[in-house]
Amino acid sequence: MKHIICALLMVATALGMGSCKNQNSASQESGDTDTVAVTTVQFNADSAYAEIVAQCDFGPRVPNTEAHAACCRYIVERFKSLGLSVIEQKADLKTFEGKTWHSTNIIASYKPELKDRIIICSHWDSRPWADADPDTAKHRTPVMAANDGASGVAVMIEVARLLDQLKPAVGIDFICFDSEDGGAPYWEEAKAPQDGSDWCLGSQYWSSHPHVEGYTARYGILLDMVGGTDARYCYEGVSLRYARDVTLRLWDAAQRAGAGNLFLQQEGGYAQDDHVPMNEVAGIPTVDIIPFVEGEHTFGATWHTVSDTPENISRETLRGVGQTLLQMISEEK
C-alpha cells in the first residue's frame, strides 16, 4: 500500500474526512460500549502466529514465483479444511512496468447460501523490493511480509476456524487479494501513475469483477499489517469518508474486546489500499485496519524492509485485532 501524505489531502477535511491529528469529532460519535454483550469465543494468537510462519516458510510470495504458487495452494487448502467454500479468481494483471503478474484472488465463503454478508479481507502477496530498508544495499531484496501480508491472512484463518463456535447471523466472505504490493519503488517513480493505481491490482480487479454476479455485502473490513509490535490503529481517512458508521462501530467493538490500547479513538492518516476500490468501485463500505504510528515510520519500523519477519510479530497485536473481529461479527443481527 502507498501512504498518502496528509498535507496533500487538506481538502479532505472539507469533505468530512478529518485530519491526520487527533480530533474529537469522530470519537464523540462512538457508541455506548456498555450495553452490548461481549462474546465468550476467544481468539488464539498462537494459532494465528503459526499461520504466519507457515506462509513465510514458502519464502517471499512475490507473484510469478514458485513460493507464491505454493502459498496460494496452502491458503486454499487451509480454508477448505475449515469447511469453507473456496473460489480462486485468476487474472493476468499488468504492473507499472508493463509486466504481467499471474494473480489469484482467493475467496473463502462461510455459509455462501446466506444473502446478508460481510467481507473480511487482506492481501497475501509480498513486495518485491525492501525499498524502505535502512540498508540501501537491500532495497532490491524481496520482503518476507510476515506483517505486511501474512498477518492478515493468518487472522482470517483463525477467525474462520472459530465461526462454528461463534455462530454468526450473516455469511462471511474472506478475500485474500493478490498483487497488492507491486507499486513502483522510488527508483521507478517516473514510470508510476500519479493516481496510485500501480498498487492494489487484485482488489481493483475484484471490485470490477466480483466473484459472484451482482454481489453485495453489508460492509468490509480490510486487515493490513495486523501483527506489528509497534502497531496502533486510528480512524483511517478514506474509511471515515465512505464507511464512517462501520468504522466507529468497529472501534467500539475493539473497546469491548479489550483492545482499546491498540484501537485509538482518534483520526490518523490516509492510505492508498485495497479498501479504496472496494469503496469507490464495488460500492461496499469498507474500513481499513492499518497502523498509524507518529514519526518517521508511519506504518511501523518493519514496513517494506527485510525485517518484516515472524520474529518481529506481536501475538498481543494479533489477539487484539482477532478478538475485535470476533466481537464485531457477534454483534451482527
Give the role of each language-model region:
Residues 15-19:
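C-terminal motif of bacterial Sec signal peptides marking the signal peptidase cleavage site
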Residues 21-23:
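Bacterial signal peptide processing site
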Residues 25-71, 82, 297-312:
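N-terminal capping segment at the start of a domain
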Residues 34-42, 57-66, 93-96, 138-150, ...:
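Second-shell loop/turn segments in exported
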Residues 57-113:
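A non-catalytic alpha/beta surface segment that caps or lines the substrate-entry region
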Residues 61-63, 92-95, 112-114, 124-128, ...:
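Solvent-exposed loop/turn segments at secondary-structure junctions
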Residues 90, 100, 219, 226-333:
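Active-site-adjacent substrate-binding region
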Residues 140-245:
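Acidic/histidine-rich catalytic neighborhood of metal-dependent amide-processing enzymes
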